[in-house]
Amino acid sequence: MGDNYYNDKLNAEKLFKVYDTKIMRIKQYLKAEIDYVRSSINADKTVIELGAGYGRIIKELAPFCKSVIGIDISENNVVLAKEYLKILPNADVIKMDVHNITVKSTFDIVLCLQNGISSMGMTPEDIKNIMKLLNFGGHAFFSTYSAKFWDCRLEWFEEQAANGLLGEIDTENTGDGVIVCKDGFRATTKSPEEFEKLGRMTGYPLKIVEVDNSSLFLVISKE
């Protein structure tokens, strides 16, 4: 269960609460992802984020780039994002399905962070279409969880469940990188091998980078 769960159940204010975590290691992980992509952004860059939620990442990046737009499937997320980002003239979020992207512009940077590639159920065809959004010389960043981060990741999802943001964790079926909740929620990840396969399929140069012992990045360059 991917896109639909986030669209129907875990959006807007609930999604905001997910990131209002008390777990310091999770806060470090979230910051490390943003810091990593920000190192490739400057004032001349145009950016698009896929699965932008309420604009958490966009708000952090907008001061460092020319413009940043996000797309998200949830109308509630988009409404909250427009309010959250209203003081940033170079930032916006629009309602759109990542599996049917109709944006006409192209960008220097494409972002799909915080395991969006898994939670949105992206297919190889989706990845090919996403690469069409990139200008020549641009870079696409996809991130998932590092296997080293399992204990902290599970603790975070347990916190979310305790706060009523997710269903109770199904401990019997949770493990080996997969978190299952009793309300039907299922969170998977991508392995380095899966990232390698997806990247090579595009025909463009790629690299796989582990960041902060918490994130695994697939970076594809349109060269």
Protein language model regions, located:
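Conserved class I S-adenosyl-L-methionine
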Residues: 1-42
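Class I SAM-dependent methyltransferase "Motif I" SAM/SAH-binding loop
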Residues: 51-53
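Class I SAM-dependent methyltransferase SAM/SAH-binding core
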Residues: 56, 61-99
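A short SAM/SAH-binding and catalytic strip from SAM-dependent methyltransferases
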Residues: 109-122
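Core SAM-dependent methyltransferase catalytic element
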Residues: 204, 208-223
